Amino acid sequence: MPIRVPDELPAVSFLRNENVFVMASSRAKTQEIRPLKVLILNLMPKKIETENQFLRLLSNSPLQIDIQLLRIDSRESKNTPAEHLNNFYCDFEDIQDENFDGLIVTGAPLGLVDFCDVAYWPQIERVIDWAKNHVTSTLFVCWAVQAALNILYGIPKMTREVKLSGVYQHQTLQQHALLTRGFDETFLAPHSRYADFPTEIIRQYTDLDILAESEQTGAYLFASKDKRLAFVTGHPEYDALTLAGEYCRDNDAGLNPVVPLNYFPDDNPELTPKASWRSHGHLLFANWLNYYVYQITPYDLRHMNPTLE
């Protein structure tokens, strides 16, 4: 699906170089099509890199998606130019009276930070509560999953002693579920987190359907029965070199990180890794857009009643 973004957004030229169909707003306005409105709450430090990753996965379908980027942290960014944030991001107050077909809440490097110490925790709570009445389906990724489980289900923060980092094999538990339609019985996906998501805890404290898991990673993909909530605890959006960049960053900082599992050839950080999860990431996002967003959202968002019959 061609994604509609501002003409000047850096992702436009970046993704077009990959032959990804990106439609600038100026052209999209000439087509009489009701685009899906998708809001992305980008909590990652390197926002431009994260934009490229998610927009790539959202682009592979025949309908238009109108992308809106949201920020909730008013502090000065160390990794993204202020001009970029001011030009391409909106504040919550700008969109709080609008409705959206989809919302994506990204991960954040906050695995060792208590919720009460997260600078924008009240804003996270506000957005998640707001989405109940203003968004058809919300997709939470990595740390955002942990935050949402706490806010929506009261599940306390669970933290691993050692960071989970690498590319892991997962089992599809419900192959005929809409979100896993077309999945192989086993598939690979990257993880980079301290957060822990034991399958038994998800089953005990929620009514969410667990769709994919791994012995090493715990629950990977789960969703609400009404399709309004979807959770993915890994990073299917990551580029081939994202884990390598994180490993080098932590190593340079003297944190003595573990080498990401099943990632570098021969587990040698001097060798260039290859992505083994791209097809899974594209299929996951295509299924979410089709079955959780497009097929249940109203044509007129002013008449939103995002529930299944």
Swiss-Prot record:
Lineage: Bacteria, Pseudomonadati, Pseudomonadota, Gammaproteobacteria, Enterobacterales
Molecular function terms, GO-annotated: homoserine O-acetyltransferase activity; homoserine O-succinyltransferase activity
Residues annotated as binding substrate: 163, 192, 249
Compartmental location: Cytoplasm
Catalytic reactions of this protein: L-homoserine + succinyl-CoA = O-succinyl-L-homoserine + CoA
Residue positions of the active site: 142, 235, 237
NCBIfam families: metA (TIGR01001)
Function: Transfers a succinyl group from succinyl-CoA to L-homoserine, forming succinyl-L-homoserine.
Organism this protein belongs to: Serratia proteamaculans (strain 568)
GO CC annotation: cytoplasm
UniProt keyword list: Acyltransferase, Amino-acid biosynthesis, Cytoplasm, Methionine biosynthesis, Transferase
Pfam families according to UniProt: HTS
Site location (Important for acyl-CoA specificity): 111
Record-marked site positions (Important for substrate specificity): 192
The keyword Transcription regulation is annotated on this UniProt entry: no
Signal sequence coordinates: none
Protein family membership: Belongs to the MetA family.
Cystine pairs: none
Stated name of the protein: Homoserine O-succinyltransferase
